[in-house]
Amino acid sequence: MTMVEHYPFKIHSDFEPQGDQPQAIKEIVEGIKAGKRHQTLLGATGTGKTFTMSNVIKEVGKPTLIIAHNKTLAGQLYSEFKEFFPENRVEYFVSYYDYYQPEAYVPSTDTFIEKDASINDEIDQLRHSATSALFERDDVIIIASVSCIYGLGNPEEYKDLVVSVRVGMEMDRSELLRKLVDVQYTRNDIDFQRGTFRVRGDVVEIFPASKEELCIRVEFFGDEIDRIREVNYLTGEVLKEREHFAIFPASHFVTREEKLKVAIERIEKELEERLKELRDENKLLEAQRLEQRTNYDLEMMREMGFCSGIENYSVHLTLRPLGSTPYTLLDYFGDDWLVMIDESHVTLPQVRGMYNGDRARKQVLVDHGFRLPSALDNRPLKFEEFEEKTKQLVYVSATPGPYEIEHTDKMVEQIIRPTGLLDPKIEVRPTENQIDDLLSEIQTRVERNERVLVTTLTKKMSEDLTTYMKEAGIKVNYLHSEIKTLERIEIIRDLRMGTYDVIVGINLLREGIDIPEVSLVVILDADKEGFLRSNRSLIQTIGRAARNDKGEVIMYADKMTDSMKYAIDETQRRREIQMKHNEKHGITPKTINKKIHDLISATVENDENNDKAQTVIPKKMTKKERQKTIDNIEKEMKQAAKDLDFEKATELRDMLFELKAEG
């Protein structure tokens, strides 16, 4: 059993809060202390939202979970918070699959797709570091992706099974080895790595699952622990002497032997009932398949205490009733903690959509005898469950979504940029001769060594425009949905370094596109109402020019839509607030000088697996099948638009056009 130690949060920064940051910090902190459940920080681009969040955490002093909508963004936040809080525990918790293909079954072609997952060791270590930190001290900030609402083992079991070693403790060597095996550590005297231990005479060396290079050397004298030291596992260098060390389990799905026996009995009982059901329905192939697969897993559990895909039996292993809420990272926090949701207008819809997508895939596996019905309980939280488990939330967004607006009585605004930078000037120009006009504007920026972003409505237009610009001698690249995360980051870096002067794309709202060198953002077809030109996405796009003191936006349009009017008025309002502040304090706007943070190497992963449209269109279809496909795509498109994933929505819209044209 470990005791949680108390440490205050300490910010390391050369800056003090300024502009309207102090007011925003004060309002949010007072709201939290008064027990407010929902608060929203409406922070314009470049106003230092991360710094405000850090100051709120410091003032409130609670363990905090910060949820971002993908691994890349979580990685950027992790780097920033680690810089602000070097003395505190800043942790990182994302899905640990480098490449993850969940198991699935396609009935029409009778294809079973095995789970194919290569676990990324670095991320696995960081996940263990995050969960163990919560049981060791209270100054913990965990940056997580939405995967934090997926099932995890029972936190009480995880905490109770900690192997605690203390100098002077009575314990013989074989007892320690037995305890380590119970918590899923394996003995390996040759290939010493995380989650293993090795034995040399009276010395046991343990490589904790939560550490990167540090192992623990426990020296025995008879039946007593004589000495505990932290050692670098590669060099063998002794780092420091320890009086005490807590070794957390090597797996989050660890179960005591007596509980495992009960779990196995429960699984056998469920298997028996399900086989009867399938045979009564004359589903003999499915029954045979289920019997074979489940019995193999049970055999592995009896022998090894573990099996591949053990998470599918989590409801039995944690002895929960069927259909009950799964344990997640949220349960590892105590009673008094804080949740911050970054880019909440994108992250919350993701949290909301996780359960349904997961359920649909697993239901097919259950129906066809690949899994027991209880596998449906290894799932992400439903949105209502997420709401139940979280006590106090701060939503952070430049354009809060409907949920935040509905649940927050008063927005905490952060409009003023400490740098004095103004929101960009916006000009609306007619579409006639727009491309020639655009080229001359680009030329002006190139001469000043500045960069340009151009956003279009369709993939074809992006491609044609890029080709046209290349022929005109402009250094341009096209950012589209097929580009993988790593390449995407490289293209943005190349833009900053001047390899390119222009980037063309459909959705330039995704992470990492806050580029100070960009002085011009061009919005083509600004008057075409739709999800790509809604007031929220227009404001976000305009914000991309707000990090440069010469920032301008040109909208090409032949009429003024409501969305355009709202975005232009809101930008002007923010511009005036900033101008007054600058005048009062004698601030001259200056372009941000922003260094590029190193991301955790492991964050540059297959985010793109989730970017592509899920719907595959078969070549030949009946009229009925075609209509069903159209309905499905329409549904998916609306969801993607709601989630601000406009590239995916556009791809789906193009599919719809094709289908309707063929019909």
Swiss-Prot record:
Pfam families with a match to the protein in the record: Helicase_C (PF00271), ResIII (PF04851), UVR (PF02151), UvrB (PF12344), UvrB_inter (PF17757)
Coiled coil: none
Span of the annotated motif Beta-hairpin: 96-119
Keyword NADP: no
Oligomer status and interactors: Forms a heterotetramer with UvrA during the search for lesions. Interacts with UvrC in an incision complex.
Purpose: The UvrABC repair system catalyzes the recognition and processing of DNA lesions. A damage recognition complex composed of 2 UvrA and 2 UvrB subunits scans DNA for abnormalities. Upon binding of the UvrA(2)B(2) complex to a putative damaged site, the DNA wraps around one UvrB monomer. DNA wrap is dependent on ATP binding by UvrB and probably causes local melting of the DNA helix, facilitating insertion of UvrB beta-hairpin between the DNA strands. Then UvrB probes one DNA strand for the presence of a lesion.
Name of the protein described by the UniProt record: UvrABC system protein B
Organism: Staphylococcus aureus (strain COL)
Lineage, top ranks: Bacteria, Bacillati, Bacillota, Bacilli, Bacillales
